[in-house]
Amino acid sequence: MKKSRKKENMDSKERNQKEAERSEARNSESPAEKAGETKVSPENEPSSPEAEKNPEEACREENEILKDQLFRLAADFDNFRKRTARQMEENRKSVLEQVLLDFVEVTDNFDRAIKSARTAEDMGPIVSGIEQLSKQFFSILEKYGLERVKCEKAGEFDPHRHEAIHHIETSEVPDNTIVEIYKEGYALNEKVVRPALVSVARSPEEAEK
């Protein structure tokens, strides 16, 4: 009888000890483990819509963006070209208008001179008036950059400014001397636009070669 009670006491102690161990094990678990939660790794996280895009689709979208930018640049350049062309044409017309208005003044003076010449008995004033008109006319040309090419009789022939239309054999003057001037030459802003037409001396010895 005593042995039976002793055995029951030992079994009770063992049960209490095991129960205490199980209780201690439960208390040492983390809240996440108690709730049965599992930690999600970065690899298992759901990806964003941007990250899920197909590389080919992303490349196609970028290509469309670049194409749109190119079309916009082309349109801007075309508008700039047309605007510049219009502005240049307006400037050309404005300059031409001013030039023509300047020459209209000379035309008015020519008309007055012609009327006076028809009834004048003394041509002296008429000649003087025409000379003044010539000066007025050329002053307008100079205003826009036109000037006479330097060319004088007995001067030296310059192939860059003069054009020899005749050669006169003579030993009285050196070779390449200007003998006669047929037409004046003109330069616009220092560029020869029409050479002076002249005759040039050439020695008989040079002509025989």
From Swiss-Prot:
Source superkingdom: Archaea
UniProt-listed GO biological process terms: protein folding
Residues that span the membrane, as ranges: none
Subcellular location per the Swiss-Prot or TrEMBL entry: Cytoplasm
Induction notes from the record: By heat shock.
Region annotated Disordered, chain positions: 1-63
Extent of Basic and acidic residues compositional bias: 7-42, 50-63
GO molecular function, one term: adenyl-nucleotide exchange factor activity
InterPro entries: GrpE (IPR000740), GrpE_coiled_coil (IPR013805), GrpE_head (IPR009012)
Keywords of the record: Chaperone, Cytoplasm, Stress response
GO CC terms, sorted: cytoplasm
Main location: cytoplasm
Coiled-coil regions listed in the entry: none
Protein's job: Participates actively in the response to hyperosmotic and heat shock by preventing the aggregation of stress-denatured proteins, in association with DnaK and GrpE. It is the nucleotide exchange factor for DnaK and may function as a thermosensor. Unfolded proteins bind initially to DnaJ; upon interaction with the DnaJ-bound protein, DnaK hydrolyzes its bound ATP, resulting in the formation of a stable complex. GrpE releases ADP from DnaK; ATP binding to DnaK triggers the release of the substrate protein, thus completing the reaction cycle.
Assembly and oligomerization: Homodimer.
Family affiliation: Belongs to the GrpE family.
Protein name: Protein GrpE
Classification lineage: Archaea, Methanobacteriati, Methanobacteriota, Stenosarchaea group, Methanomicrobia
